[in-house]
């Protein structure tokens, strides 16, 4: 939750917060599978959005697309929030889905040269011979 210019990132024995006035435009979240990278990114995107900071997020796997809808308030989540002293309630965030094909979201306008050969080959599902042409 963003309160008084801070964004709560996590809490163990101490609170870990990001101070919004000194937040960097770029960052790196790295770690092994299951260490909370996606959860951290989702929390940061939600917090920045609530603070009025625009967020651009490339979600190739679709792990974070759920930001658009409020979550379900489950018992264990409410218990954890209360234990941490958080006044948590599920809420959605403003989301625009960009769609390279312009079918299921906001059309992404790009030229063939801007897309590049690798992505173009994937979009057209080319085989190795076709890619070489």
For every predicted segment, state its role.
Residues 1-93:
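Glycine-rich phosphate-binding loop of nucleotide-binding enzymes
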Residues 81-133:
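Helical/strand "switch-coupling" subdomains that flank nucleotide/phosphate-binding cores, especially
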